[in-house]
């Protein structure tokens, strides 16, 4: 089992006083944990406050970067130092300590930036208290939740469950699977790949539903059907072909 704790301070020369430590250069940032992953993996990221980005592409390794959102803030640096990265049996976990004594949903929390590069088709589970979650590239099934912040999944290959109490949710281009999207305050936007059929079930308490999909030629099988369940208490829902996004 490979286990490593990302320490932002390790990127700097130990002789430099903390108050004078520079922002890490591109060369210094290359000392990031790398795992050999010839097949898609399962990614789980849990942060209290910050930005989480998982990028899927045609690659045979997984690279993890954890940085303070602001290298000049001691609290952000400490949060990055304490973030733990573990990889075993095709599963990657990135977690920050749950210190609810210093956490507040109103902002001002220590914040970090997590970036994970994975093989195409990898699954992604992510949670954040305050922040933003982005899934880029062709990811597998995604389960994402943010208390306050936006969620974006660009090109999912499978199903997506995304929930935020306050924020927007956007799916760039869905081809198949089930999309379960829910926000209390915010907009929901779904792009359907041209040629794929869609079955919609939307619930909006205060807002509007804009179905901009055109007809699809021929009967569509399950492999080319997207089932969308979208719910917003206060906000709009937009369903459209991805080419129109």
Language-model region placement:
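Residues that act as N-cap/strand-start positions at coil-to-secondary-structure junctions
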Residues: 29, 39, 48, 77-80, ...
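Surface loops and adjacent helix of pleckstrin homology
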Residues: 48, 57, 67, 97-99, ...
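Short, surface-exposed interaction patches in beta-rich subdomains
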Residues: 168-245
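Right-handed parallel beta-helix
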Residues: 33-36, 82-158, 223-245
